[in-house]
From Swiss-Prot:
The protein's role, per its UniProt record: Cell wall formation.
GO CC annotation: cytosol
Active-site residues, record numbering mapped to chain: 175, 225 (proton donor), 295
Cofactor: FAD
Protein name as catalogued: UDP-N-acetylenolpyruvoylglucosamine reductase
Length: 304
């Protein structure tokens, strides 16, 4: 960006929290990721629209990062604007419906539902990430998923327009939605729940959280579940059968607590993650004949 455009950015986007050449590893669950050219934290939709309008006017690429939980940002970082929705995190309850902004924490949203004795969101009680990312990926666990409860989502198009997509038009599948094809960004979502008993809902949430603590390597940075579940198999079991528990490249290793996870144990890099993922896919294929498909998204530029 030239000096004149940089001055225009500072003038047009005055008052918005924008950080230049900001390392993204400070914000990712993996603790890896190179710099964003411009990392923006809009406080409301008006600031969001200003950022997108400026970026589109100057043909600067932009994307939303979300909570960066099921994501690997490459070591070369991301060009253009990276927009964080941390401050767009409102949650409201209207009858049996919960509406949340895209930056709302998924776990916090389940707690709000529980407080209002609304059942249906318990499956997500321990899933890290944001509402926007959860809708984008059709997040799920323990038999539940976003597709079961979503009513509609407001999305931002690449042109900066807003439209509403009903759940039936989301084309939900296993860890997928139509948004992965259109590139549209969730800015809020509405969920339909059912009345329930507060103590029973709380007990179920605590039970699922306890299971996660027992089975998942929460003590290390990670990108969550690395691979999709292959039909008729479990990814973690296939990885164990290939004797890959503890298998390590650089600072990243296959978790010995849950082989479906890869953990950053010693200042690992995104390249370590990518190399380990590729190695595990190859060795599982050789051992079982099954080709694992990554669930984690990998974005950004590689280092030259």
């Amino acid at each position: 960006m030239g000096i004149n455009m940089l001055d225009e950015l500072k003038e047009d986007l005055v008052g918005i929290d924008i950080r230049f050449d900001e390392p993204l590893k400070r914000y990712t669950y993996t603790k890896v990721g190179g710099p964003a050219d411009y990392l923006a934290f809009p406080r409301n939709r008006y600031e969001l629209f200003r950022i997108v309008k400026f970026a589109n006017k100057h043909n600067i690429p932009w994307m939303v990062l979300g909570n960066a939980s099921n994501l690997i940002v490459r070591d070369g970082g991301i060009r253009g604007f990276v927009i964080m929705f941390d401050k767009l995190n409102g949650i409201a309850v209207n009858g049996y419906q919960v509406e949340a902004e895209a930056g709302a924490n998924l776990i916090a949203t389940t707690k709000v539902a529980c407080f209002h004795s609304l059942t249906g969101f318990e499956f997500a009680a321990g899933i890290p990430g944001s509402i926007g990312g959860a809708v984008f990926m059709n997040a799920g666990a323990y038999g539940g998923e976003i597709a079961h409860i979503l009513v509609s989502a407001q999305v931002l198009t690449k042109d900066g327009d807003i439209r509403t997509i009903d759940a039936r038009d989301m084309r939900f599948g296993y860890r997928r939605s139509v948004l992965q094809e259109t590139g549209e960004v969730v800015i809020s979502a509405k969920f339909n729940l059912k009345p329930g008993d507060y103590e029973q809902i709380k007990h179920e949430m605590n039970r699922l959280n306890h299971l996660r603590e027992l089975k998942q390597p929460l003590e290390y940075p990670s990108c969550g579940s690395v691979f999709k579940r292959p039909p008729g198999h479990f990814a973690g079991q296939l990885i164990m059968e290939a004797n890959l528990e503890g298998h390590r490249i650089g600072g990243v290793e296959v978790s010995t607590k849950h082989a479906g996870f890869m953990v950053n144990v010693d200042q690992g890099t995104a390249k370590d993650y990518e190399d380990l993922i590729a190695d595990v896919i190859a060795k599982v294929k050789e051992n079982s004949g099954v080709t694992l498909e990554p669930e984690v998204r990998i974005i950004g530029d590689k280092l030259n």
